[in-house]
């Protein structure tokens, strides 16, 4: 697939060069990417979940896939009418950094998961490393967000409220 080729030929080396290696818990040297419509309540506009990494998948336990896997949304991430797989490339880099970060922090260093705000910042940096460009798409949201204007803290990661402010 086009998505897999982009990951293998471009994203993988760029992200691992800056952030380190992924784990290999199943000893197959493969990373799985599951693309599906993440049921996130998207109503046609606003925020949606573009993808995610679930650290439990790296463990041999119940409700785990027991492998290196991350998940990419197909709706609306690929577009609503004309599907464009290239719209997911930055999300691939973003979610891959989460996997690497967990491997480095927890498995290699024996620590705990990195604070969400810092881990998300590093995943945003992975997007920039991959594209070679500054991420400017969120500047308008930052400038006009009412929660940021009211003092929304960089250190407080609000998963239930104004999620887009976290990424701005």
Where do the protein language model's features map onto the residues?
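Juxtacatalytic substrate-recognition/specificity segment
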Residues: 1-115, 122, 126, 132-136, ...
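Active-site-proximal alpha-helical
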Residues: 147-168
């Amino acid at each position: 697939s086009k998505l897999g080729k982009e990951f293998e030929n471009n994203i993988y080396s760029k992200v691992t060069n800056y952030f380190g290696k992924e784990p290999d818990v199943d000893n197959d040297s493969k990373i799985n990417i599951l693309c599906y419509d993440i049921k996130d309540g998207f109503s046609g506009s606003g925020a949606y979940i573009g993808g995610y990494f679930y650290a439990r998948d790296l463990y041999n336990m119940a409700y785990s896939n027991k492998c290196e896997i991350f998940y990419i949304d197909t709706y609306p991430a690929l577009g609503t009418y004309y599907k464009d797989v290239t719209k997911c490339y930055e999300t691939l880099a973003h979610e891959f950094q989460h996997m690497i970060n967990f491997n480095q922090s927890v498995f290699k260093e024996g620590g705990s998961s990195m604070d969400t705000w810092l881990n998300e910042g590093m995943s945003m940096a992975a997007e920039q490393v991959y594209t070679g460009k500054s991420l400017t798409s969120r500047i308008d949201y930052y400038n006009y967000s009412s929660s940021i204007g009211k003092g929304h803290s960089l250190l407080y990661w609000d998963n239930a409220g104004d999620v887009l402010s976290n990424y701005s």
